Amino acid sequence: MLKEIRPAIFVLLALTLITGLLYPLAMTGLAVTIFPAQAAGSLITRNGQVIGSALIGQEFKDDRYFHGRPSATSTADPNDSTKTVPAPYNAANSSGSNLGPTSKALADRVKEDVDKLKAENPAQPVPVDLVTTSASGLDPHVSPEAAMFQVPRVAKARGVPEDRVRALVVKNTEGRLIGLLGEPRVNVLALNLALDAATATK
């Protein structure tokens, strides 16, 4: 019987070694060698300090900054471990809201967001990604339209011409991958850092 089982045990051990150890180590080594920044998490630093990742969004509330998409991520309620409380862009708990299209809570939240944005820029239609969450809750990008929509607010809060802020949006707009894949997008953290740098001295 051992003779019949031995090949199966050998294959199990060999595949475990190859796919569980050698392959991951080889891929990690290649990634660190060829794409060191991406392998380290695409971290963004300022003055030598890590302030975020290009792959994970952050919540911005100040009018002087561009805002990202709504985030439905949550964290454990410190007062009741059986419940959760909202924690936007919580990278330790990536998730969507799980609210369906007939949900009153979802409809009320979207309406509230739309009303706030219309008050901010009544002349322009509200871009859909400014009122809808991503599946992960961590999307670091908004559409160019969503960024442009916020230009008047940001420019007013910083006391700079709108054209200057608009030019930064254009400069920080990423195109489709190899011209075909995905949609044009703007990384909110990168844009806000560029905004800080450009307006440090007006």
Curated annotation (Swiss-Prot):
Q: How does it assemble?
A: The system is composed of three essential subunits: KdpA, KdpB and KdpC.
Which superkingdom does the taxonomy of this entry point to? Bacteria
A GO CC term attached to the entry? plasma membrane
Q: Which gene encodes it?
A: kdpC
Please state what the protein is called: Potassium-transporting ATPase KdpC subunit
Family membership, please give it: Belongs to the KdpC family.
**Keywords linked to the UniProt accession:** ATP-binding, Cell inner membrane, Cell membrane, Ion transport, Membrane, Nucleotide-binding, Potassium, Potassium transport, Transmembrane, Transmembrane helix, Transport
**Function of the protein:** Part of the high-affinity ATP-driven potassium transport (or Kdp) system, which catalyzes the hydrolysis of ATP coupled with the electrogenic transport of potassium into the cytoplasm. This subunit acts as a catalytic chaperone that increases the ATP-binding affinity of the ATP-hydrolyzing subunit KdpB by the formation of a transient KdpB/KdpC/ATP ternary complex.
Q: Which InterPro entries match?
A: KdpC
Keyword Transport listed? The answer is: yes
Q: Where does the record place it?
A: Cell inner membrane
- Disulfide pairs here are none
Q: Where is this region: Disordered?
A: 66-103
Return the Polar residues bias intervals. Answer: 71-84, 91-101
List the membrane topology term(s).
Single-pass membrane protein
A Pfam match: KdpC
Q: Record keywords: Chloroplast included?
A: no
What molecular function terms (GO) are annotated for this protein? Answer: ATP binding; P-type potassium transmembrane transporter activity
The UniProt transmembrane annotation reads 7-27
